[in-house]
């Protein structure tokens, strides 16, 4: 698996074990994969609005044999989860206006 960029390593450092995370705009799924490899008790939902990006994430998740640890969902922002499913939101690699729109 490809190594995380320094930026994503910093993002990952704010996540704790036992977290219930949604990785919004997961792209290739690298951050989600990194988190489940780093933490044994974490739950991760990797989501993306772009079907091709999510397909790439699914491929990478399968390559790492992590299908049972990372759930994938196609959809926009927080629309793909219920409030009680998560306690940590990760939005990395998007512009400020996009992030504000997701959080509204």
Where on the chain are the PLM-derived regions?
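Conserved alpha-helix/loop element of class I SAM-dependent methyltransferases that forms part
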Residues: 2-18
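Conserved class I S-adenosyl-L-methionine
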Residues: 18-27
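Glycine-rich SAM-binding Motif I of class I
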Residues: 29, 33
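Conserved SAM-binding motif I beta-strand of class I
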Residues: 43-48
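Conserved SAM/SAH-binding beta-strand->alpha-helix loop
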Residues: 50-52
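S-adenosyl-L-methionine
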Residues: 55-84
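Short SAM/SAH-binding signature in class I
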Residues: 86-93
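A short, conserved alpha-helix within the catalytic core of class I
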Residues: 97-104
């Amino acid at each position: 698996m490809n190594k995380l960029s320094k930026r994503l390593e910093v993002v990952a450092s704010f996540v704790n074990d036992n977290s219930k995370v949604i990785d919004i705009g997961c792209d290739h799924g690298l951050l989600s994969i990194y988190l489940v490899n780093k933490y044994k008790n974490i739950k991760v939902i990797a989501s993306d609005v772009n079907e091709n990006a999510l397909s790439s994430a699914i491929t990478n998740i399968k390559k790492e044999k992590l299908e049972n640890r990372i759930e994938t969902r196609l959809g926009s922002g927080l629309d793909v989860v219920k409030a009680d499913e998560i306690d940590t939101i990760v939005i990395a690699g998007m512009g400020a206006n996009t992030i504000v729109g997701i959080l509204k």
